[in-house]
A protein has these predicted regions:
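Active-site cofactor/cluster-binding pocket
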Residues: 1-204, 208-210
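Thiamine diphosphate
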Residues: 2-67, 71-84, 208, 215-310, ...
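Structural motif
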Residues: 71, 92, 208, 257, ...
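Short beta-strand segments
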Residues: 74, 94-96, 262, 285-289, ...
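Short, conserved loop/helix-junction motifs that constitute active-site signature segments
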Residues: 82-90, 278, 505-510
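A short helix->loop->beta-strand "cap" motif at the edges of active sites that frequently abuts
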Residues: 87-93, 233, 282, 511-512, ...
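Gly-rich Lys/Arg/Thr-decorated short loops/hinges at beta-loop-alpha junctions or inter-strand turns
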Residues: 147, 171-186, 201-206, 224-231, ...
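Flexible, low-complexity linker and terminal segments
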Residues: 190-198, 202, 334, 339-560
Length: 560
């Protein structure tokens, strides 16, 4: 028997090697040609607690997580108790025979017989690979790649245990539907959202990253640090978030594209720096990886509750742009786009992601980085004209920008209001001119807004509107809700500010019912659309329990 779409859930304690097992399975599945989506749920502790690593795998493109489980790999007894109700009909539980699990549809594995406790994840890798019908040499190569240059004796021990697990499972009679083989596997990468943001920033020419560690944004900085020496990049862990944002502004003033990854609580400390970037007209990209608040909240869970925080952060009024990628691929491209907009319009730009997208991995086609040029840094090369006016009044609001120490001109920037030369002023007429100059940049930003993406039936009976990481779940829910008598469409915003009503209002007005799907309490995008257009959505599907929005959740909330 074969099944073309199934979900694996690995459960256990932190420290049991769940992530290693999950990553090895994910890479083996991708090398075999399958499409995957990996999601992780973990508690805020180093060891213990209950963590899960889920892989949805299919012969078709996977765009969303699924709630039901086909194969539950229980690394401890608690996992069976907590998740057996999620196992679908025809599903299977793989458990350690030493746990004394007594439940239907359970394959009891003699882990102690097949390998020592510390090799339990390798035993599970072998057993699960056989159950799925994966090519065993391919799985062995994935393990070899992971082990790399580790101790030869230890690597050989892992290989022996994997082979033993293969042989044991081959001898079992188990009623479980295997995956059909993929005829022509194509080359793809396993990459999560944060890795894609880091790669997109590198491709754009980012040269400075300052950060203070905060889940779920930290791995952006860690991925950049891993490439720092090769790419000529400085990554600085600051003493706090206030220092991090100001370091990035200083680096950008000196001429290098700069990025600051953080989360809601850390970003709250950065808001004065955001205002400084707005007044000094200094480019900076701030990545806000959302998690549930207020305060510490649920630091390892997901939410979409910081749109309004980012939209209004920083005292005073100044232009900004806010991007909200919905896929791993969009994380890459919008990281590039964000740095480009920041440089072109000289100010703060935000990339809003969340724990679900940050930590979720997908099989993606490799990005053609070799043919991508770094972004234009927006710095004037010809500095021969005199006098130099950093804040010259221009029709676009964008003024000439030179780097300090690179020409004979004095380069000045500061947080006080200023005339065209950048020095302090309290002339109120100048104040009016400068506010108008800065705000004129909004027109240029609006001219380059990424339009929301409409998919589905024109003039739909039901239109699902969303932003950010909920994109895949909304698309899959729409496909399930669509039938011969019901037209369904979706509208996804990958840029949530500024809004350009002409790009999307027609879709809203032509739909029978408009439902906004968001991971927050109030429906922040719905409120923003109402504020900017006067259009009120008819219903809202909202989730704020720390779990990602799923297609099943949307359908349940709609009552379908």
């Amino acid at each position: 028997m074969e099944k073309t779409d199934l979900t694996l859930l690995i459960g256990g304690e932190a420290g049991q090697g769940l992530v290693t097992l999950g990553q090895l399975l994910a890479k083996s599945l991708v090398h075999a040609g399958y499409s995957i989506l990996v999601t992780q749920s973990y508690q805020s502790r180093i060891r213990g607690g209950h963590n899960t690593f889920a892989i949805r795998v299919s012969t078709e493109a996977v765009v969303a997580p699924r709630e039901s489980v086909d194969l539950l790999i229980a690394m401890n007894a608690e996992t069976v108790t907590l998740h057996k109700a999620e196992v679908a009909d025809g599903g299977l539980i793989v458990a350690d025979e030493a746990h004394g699990t007594e439940t239907d549809g359970c394959l009891l594995v003699p882990y102690q017989q097949l390998g020592e406790t510390r090799f339990a994840n390798v035993v599970a890798l072998g057993v699960v690979s056989v159950l799925l019908g994966l090519d065993q040499p391919l799985v062995a190569r994935s393990l070899d790649d992971f082990l790399g240059k580790k101790d030869h004796e230890m690597a050989e021990k892992n290989r022996q245990i994997l082979t033993t697990a293969f042989d044991w499972c081959d001898q079992q009679t188990v009623a479980f539907e295997k995956l059909p083989p993929v005829a022509k596997p194509i080359q793809r990468l396993v990459m999560n959202g944060n890795e894609a943001i880091a790669m997109g920033a590198l491709s754009a020419g980012v040269k400075f990253c300052s950060f203070y560690p905060m889940t779920p944004a930290t791995s952006i900085a860690l991925n950049l640090a891993a490439q720092a020496s090769r790419m000529g990049l400085v990554v600085e862990q600051a003493e706090d978030e206030i220092a991090a944002i100001n370091m990035a502004i200083g680096a950008s003033f000196a001429g290098v594209p700069s990025i600051v990854p953080t989360s809601g609580g850390g970003f709250a400390l950065m808001t004065e720096g955001v205002s400084l970037a707005g007044m000094s007209e200094t480019p900076v990209l701030i990545v806000v990886a959302q998690r549930p608040g207020p305060a510490t909240g649920l630091p390892t869970r997901t939410e979409q509750a910081d749109l309004e925080l980012v939209l209004y952060a920083g005292h005073g009024e100044f232009p900004r742009a806010i991007f909200s990628p919905g896929t791993v691929e969009e994380c890459f491209w919008l990281a590039r786009k964000s740095l480009e907009v920041a440089a072109k319009f000289q100010g703060p730009v935000f990339l809003l992601t969340d724990q679900f997208l940050a930590d979720s991995s997908r099989a993606v086609t490799p990005f053609d980085i070799d043919n991508l040029e770094p972004i234009d840094p927006g710095v004037e090369i010809d500095a021969s004209s005199l006098p130099y006016r950093r804040y010259a009044i221009t029709p676009s609001g964008v003024s000439p920008r030179l780097l300090p120490g690179m020409t004979k001109h004095l380069v000045v920037a500061g947080g006080d209001e200023h005339p065209v030369d950048g020095h302090l002023t309290e002339d109120l007429n100048v104040r009016n001119l400068m506010v108008a100059k800065r705000l004129r940049k909004e027109q240029g930003i609006m001219a380059e807004v990424v339009p929301p993406e409409f998919q589905g039936d024109e003039g739909p009976d039901l239109l699902l509107v969303t932003w950010g990481s909920s994109k895949g779940s909304v698309l899959e829910a729409a496909a399930k809700l669509r039938n011969d008598s019901r037209r369904v469409g979706t509208l996804h915003f990958s840029q949530v500010w500024p809004l350009v009503p002409d790009q999307f209002l027609g879709y809203l007005e032509s739909a029978g019912e408009v439902v906004c799907v968001e991971g927050n309490v109030y429906g922040q995008l719905a409120r923003l659309i109402r504020r900017e257009t006067g259009f009120g959505v008819h219903r809202r599907v909202l989730r704020y329990d720390g779990l990602p929005i799923t297609p099943e959740y949307i359908i349940r909330e709609l009552g379908d």
